[in-house]
Amino acid sequence: MDLVALQSLLDNTSFLVLFLTMLLYWGGAAFPNIPGLTGLGTLGVAIANLCMATLLGARWLEAGYFPLSNLYESLFFLAWGVTTMHLVAEWMSRSRWVGVITAPVAMGITAFAALSLPAEMQNSAPLVPALKSNWLMMHVSVMMISYAALLVGSLLAIAFLIVTKGQKIELRGSSVGNGSYRLRQPQNTTDETPVTVVAFQKTEPQSNGNTAVLASPDLQQLTTTPALSPQMLSLADTLDNISYRIIGLGFPLLTIGIIAGAVWANEAWGSYWSWDPKETWALITWLVFAAYLHARITRGWQGRQPAFLAAAGFFVVWVCYLGVNILGKGLHSYGWFF
């Protein structure tokens, strides 16, 4: 069997299937009354996931090492991870919104790897001595899976912001005083009927220090906000919850990956941490999502505030993963490819 030809077939097939899958999810969102579109989208993601897993397996057999040594291999591993996390998130949420926002990202990753990278960057090559270690599989694979989980979790947070139009809403289980308000609909009104939301000020202590009272609302703070339908409120609650869970999965993987990388660096170069650009941005990524989880667990944040933090984390992950490669600097660089 010609493994090189098989890989070329599988990378183009993965791109085509994900492109069609993206259209199916978008069609299902635009025309929810058409049955089966979302189910076909899920099937497409599963097929693409299998194609990419087979591609990586074929590359492993051809090259004789775990396929994470160059940008082409890592991009397809990332796309495989994104589709895997997509299937997990969709199974947990039962929502077509997951595919609407994750399928384009997975498709874009495969398009970049299969159609944009030059042929010399797609071909396998002998490993440099520093990469001939079991740490290649242990460190890099965990980091890539953590990137995939954090990207999908962040995308679901972005979907939450789109669904709620950036409004503050009170989610199920949110604590009193966390700054969120459910936009309630008055009876006998349609979804388009505006409702008036009163933004009350925070409680302020009396001068005797023993009693807290609710300050009077400022009439200038009265705002007219379009109501969200019960379906949109339920969807927003689901997206917020699943985003939190997926990020909660990705963060410990990122932590383990960073620690494994530090041990490998000490073994290969005699230093646990050298402030390489990739190391620096991995630390920044860790701090962003640590702040997200701290805000959710300790401060009780839900809804819009942590969603903005996760959305920022989406871009930080991309800088951490591709920024070093674009710069062409550091020990982790695959080289300048423009």
Curated annotation (Swiss-Prot):
One of its GO terms (cellular component) is plasma membrane-derived thylakoid membrane. InterPro entries: Cyt_c_assembly (IPR002541), Cyt_c_biogenesis_CcsA (IPR017562), Cyt_c_biogenesis_CcsA/CcmC (IPR045062). It is a multi-pass membrane protein. Disulfide bonds: none annotated. Keywords: Cytochrome c-type biogenesis, Membrane, Thylakoid, Transmembrane, Transmembrane helix. It is found in: Cellular thylakoid membrane. GO terms for molecular function: heme binding. One of its GO terms (biological process) is cytochrome complex assembly. It comes from the Bacteria. The chain crosses the membrane at residues 15-35, 36-56, 71-91, 97-117, 142-162, 246-266, 273-293, 307-327. May interact with ccs1. Belongs to the CcmF/CycK/Ccl1/NrfE/CcsA family. Required during biogenesis of c-type cytochromes (cytochrome c6 and cytochrome f) at the step of heme attachment. This is Cytochrome c biogenesis protein CcsA. It comes from Picosynechococcus sp. (strain ATCC 27264 / PCC 7002 / PR-6). The gene is ccsA.
